[in-house]
Amino acid sequence: IVRDYRYRGYSARETIARLDSVERGANRWIAPFQEEADVMFNSSLLFELAALKRHAEPILDEVPKYCDEYTTAHRLKKYLSYFESIPENEIPPTSFLREFVGGSSFRY
């Protein structure tokens, strides 16, 4: 949601509306072949939800209560409420997470 908003111009509502399609694509084109890959890389970070929280919450707040995507946005905000935000300067500039929140030392 954060990356789509920041770099693709999608609202949280638009991204949430696409989640079923993304999952279908992953189930069709990724999951059946992942065990055949030479290498699998888990890019999750222990601090990623704490780092994404400050970026995601205002984007999720933009989802109107009257639309179908509101329930998911509300659920995600509730989930994020269990994490404490970390300061932006505590995310290393070389962190993969910078692809989502900006400020990467890499240029592409």
Predicted segment positions?
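Conserved NTP phosphate-binding and transfer environment spanning the P-loop NTPase/kinase superfamily
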Residues: 1-108
